């Protein structure tokens, strides 16, 4: 059976990993060493934290990957290897517009702060952007929503999301590992984040070893 799967670029925030710790290079590295033990160096290589700014980005990436990115990646990889049917992978990257009064933990937040959050793609896929109160949508959001509705509808009907007028969505295959990036401009590109998922995968595999 064909598979269409993916996740969002900013699923969750750095605090999921660092809790109430200040997001610094030192706190991220200390947390990684505690969390991943003898696999910590490999994880830190995949999620670098040479500066505090880099540590903040890596903490958010690690939080998102351990929440949903790695497990979905693993599913896609196994389906590609054993499923015998086409696989299509996406990354929803659009930093979603927010209402003027949007907040995170009581602090005013912008679209850049919230990013491509968990479940943020749902209104795009179902063409229901206007059900979110207070948001002023850009023409590019409506275009992206229309294209996503068409991709998902095509896939539901035929097992292939591609169709007339849409940017080409290549199959996810071992030789290319193409990912469709859903943003103001849609484009396909090879997966560049694989080392992150492989680092987590190695840690998970070791936990299963007696």
Give names to the regions the model predicted.
Residues 91, 173, 179-180, 196-198, ...:
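Small/flexible residues
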Residues 133-147, 192-195, 199:
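A short, structured beta-strand-centered segment in the mid-to-C-terminal lobe
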Residues 1-140, 151, 158:
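Substrate-gating cap/lid region and adjacent catalytic-acid/histidine neighborhood
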Residues 146-162, 166-167:
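K/E-rich alpha-helical interaction surfaces of small helical-bundle regulatory domains
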Residues 162-189:
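Mature extracytoplasmic/periplasmic domains
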Residues 116-117, 146, 172-174:
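A structural signal for short secondary-structure junctions
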Residues 185-210:
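Tryptophan-rich aromatic "cage" segments
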Residues 98, 128-132, 175, 186-188, ...:
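A generic structural micro-environment signature
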């Amino acid at each position: 059976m064909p598979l269409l799967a993916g996740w969002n670029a900013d699923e969750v925030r750095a605090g999921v990993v660092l809790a109430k710790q200040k997001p610094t290079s030192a706190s991220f590295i200390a947390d990684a060493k505690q969390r991943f033990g003898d696999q910590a160096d490999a994880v830190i290589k995949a999620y670098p934290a040479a500066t505090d700014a880099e540590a903040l980005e890596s903490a958010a990436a690690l939080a998102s990957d351990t929440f949903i990115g790695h497990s979905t990646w693993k599913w896609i990889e196994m389906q590609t290897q054993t499923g015998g049917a086409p696989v299509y992978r996406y990354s929803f990257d659009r930093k979603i517009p927010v209402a003027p009064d949007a907040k995170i933990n009581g602090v005013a937040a912008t679209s850049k702060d919230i990013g491509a959050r968990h479940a943020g793609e749902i209104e795009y896929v179902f063409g229901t952007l206007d059900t979110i109160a207070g948001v002023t949508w850009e023409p590019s959001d409506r275009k992206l929503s229309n294209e996503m509705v068409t991709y998902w509808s095509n896939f539901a009907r035929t097992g292939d999301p591609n169709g007339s007028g849409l940017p080409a969505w290549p199959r996810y295959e071992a030789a290319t590992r193409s990912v469709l990036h859903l943003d103001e401009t849609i484009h396909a590109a090879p997966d560049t984040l694989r080392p992150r998922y492989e680092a987590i995968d190695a840690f998970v595999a070791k936990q299963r070893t007696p």
